[in-house]
């Protein structure tokens, strides 16, 4: 078993091994006293893995209740969040009980925010079942829901007590969800690991799941350990997300998160080339690897619409934005720019 220890406001382990889902209760019991467990999942994942997770938790002595919601970013809203809170209250969950997020990034964000705020905080465990969640969103403690004005506008930092990652669950991933995870993985290689970029170029992610998850989680461990609350170094994880979130919002979330991040990375790198921050070769190699993994690199949404979406980005502070910009494969810099300058950056990135 691969175990990565995360040092944050709450310390915990990320466990990675084929077959761990059936040991979820046993592993959870090592960090959380048996009581009640609330499985929060979307209807797609629950149909695949709900019964096995219940069985594993009950075997370890947990009394299990389940809450499911329709799959997709459209459910990550205040209404579903309130439904989870009502569910916890109706079943008389206490602060000593645990919410188990079974699913991808939407499930983890929503379940984590509910766990963070129900009775001012209760137990929280992550069982990621998508590649994106396994390598990124299940680790680091960011939880949130979307508002009509923008993505992840209401949320909190709330670390889990454990992350249990069974790569076997990735075998049922739809191809588009696999690609989404690959976008985040490529992001990690771009922001700080050139050797990893070469590995991804030569060997498909699906042929090295455990290794890829371990590398990404170790990188995130180091970043979160230095900057848990996103005030400095952790901002580098936003590579591709500034323009990506705008594209995602303009699509009304019909575009998946990883696809939007891929477009965001391509856009900011084009702009970096035009501004002399990085070379043409870096852009060419990034576009090549994104296309190898079947990811988009351009958007047809107009500049005005994307710029309007940028204006509600939660990363804006004091009229400024910290934009993460590639300098070369495995190295980025942070450009602090006025919000109005985002329009010029998008134009330089090929958006019209």
Where does each model-flagged region fall?
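Buried hydrophobic packing segments
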Residues: 84, 111-115, 185, 247, ...
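Short glycine/serine/threonine-rich phosphate/pyrophosphate-binding segments
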Residues: 106-113, 134-135, 246
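Solvent-exposed alpha-helices and their adjacent loops that cap or buttress functional pockets
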Residues: 31, 92-94, 117-118, 146-147, ...
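ATP/NTP phosphate-donor binding region
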Residues: 1-97
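A glycine/threonine-rich phosphate-anchoring loop and its flanking beta-alpha core
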Residues: 15, 113-202
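C-terminal charged capping/lid subdomain of soluble metabolic enzymes
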Residues: 183-185, 278-352
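Active-site segments that bind and position negatively charged phosphate/pyrophosphate groups
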Residues: 198-305
């Amino acid at each position: 078993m691969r175990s990565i220890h995360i040092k944050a406001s709450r310390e915990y382990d990320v466990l990675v091994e084929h077959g761990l889902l059936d040991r979820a209760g046993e592993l959870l019991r090592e960090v959380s006293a048996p009581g009640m467990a609330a499985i929060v999942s979307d209807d797609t994942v629950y149909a695949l893995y709900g019964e096995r997770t219940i069985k594993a938790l009950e075997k370890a002595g947990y009394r299990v209740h389940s809450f499911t919601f329709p799959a997709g970013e459209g459910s990550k809203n205040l209404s579903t969040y309130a439904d989870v809170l009502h569910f916890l209250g109706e079943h008389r969950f206490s602060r000593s009980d645990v919410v188990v997020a079974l699913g991808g990034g939407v499930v983890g964000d929503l379940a984590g925010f509910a766990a963070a705020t129900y009775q001012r905080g209760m137990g929280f465990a992550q069982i990621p079942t998508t590649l994106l969640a396994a390598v990124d969103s299940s680790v680091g403690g960011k939880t949130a829901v979307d508002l009509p004005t923008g993505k992840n506008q209401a949320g909190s930092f709330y670390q889990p007590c454990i992350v249990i990652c069974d790569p076997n669950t990735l075998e049922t991933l739809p191809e588009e969800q696999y690609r989404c995870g690959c976008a985040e993985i490529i992001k990690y290689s771009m922001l700080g690991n050139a050797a990893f970029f070469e590995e991804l170029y030569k060997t498909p992610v699906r042929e090295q799941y455990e290794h890829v998850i371990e590398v990404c989680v170790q990188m995130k461990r180091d970043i979160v350990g230095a900057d848990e609350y996103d005030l400095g170094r952790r901002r580098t994880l936003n590579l591709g997300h500034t323009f990506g979130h705008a594209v995602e919002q303009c699509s009304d979330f019909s575009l998946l998160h990883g696809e939007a991040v891929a477009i965001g990375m391509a856009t900011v790198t084009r702009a970096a080339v035009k501004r002399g921050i990085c070379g043409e070769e870096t852009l060419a190699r990034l576009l090549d690897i994104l296309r190898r993994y079947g990811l988009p690199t351009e958007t047809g949404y107009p500049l005005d619409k994307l710029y309007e979406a940028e204006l509600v980005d939660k990363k804006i502070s004091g009229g400024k934005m910290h934009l993460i910009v590639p300098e070369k494969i495995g190295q980025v810099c942070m450009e602090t720019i006025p919000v109005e300058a985002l329009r010029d950056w998008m134009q330089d990135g090929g958006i019209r």
